[in-house]
Amino acid sequence: AKEKEVTFQSGGPT
């Protein structure tokens, strides 16, 4: 998973 994908799974785009 790329950084952007992880951000979305974490909660959303920071």
UniProtKB/Swiss-Prot annotation:
Disulfide bonds: none annotated. Keywords: Neurotoxin, Secreted, Toxin. One of its GO terms (cellular component) is extracellular region. The keyword Cell membrane does not apply. It comes from the Eukaryota. The keyword Secreted applies. Its main location: secreted. Transmembrane segments: none annotated. GO terms for molecular function: toxin activity. It is found in: Secreted. Expressed by the venom gland. Belongs to the scolopendra toxin 4 family. This is Scolopendra 5885.28 Da toxin. It comes from Scolopendra viridicornis nigra (Brazilian giant centipede). The lineage of its organism: Eukaryota, Metazoa, Ecdysozoa, Arthropoda, Myriapoda.
